């Protein structure tokens, strides 16, 4: 091993707002003591950082002219759970992009408020 992963860092125009969006999904704590670098931390100590990027150009998945830089996958158990989760993330400001279909296993793609794609996956452990 050359190194250990510390945490992902997400570029965005408003770190506090985007960290707040993901905090509501994950139920993690936000540390916005530095407005240009905001932390999201789980009870177990996992972290995601959100860094201000004034010139942030959001991706437009699946448009190759504006490709995604990364995406996060979140897991729920069943299609019923993904239905509930979809309503909740959209109420937080997510934009629905794609449904892979599948009654027992699949994923749905959304944009977060800064334009980064993320997925709600279900049935992955079947």
Outline where the language-model segments fall.
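Short, small/polar residue-rich loop motifs at catalytic or cofactor-binding pockets
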Residues: 103-105
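Glyoxalase I/VOC metalloenzyme domain signal
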Residues: 1-6, 10-32, 42-95, 111-126
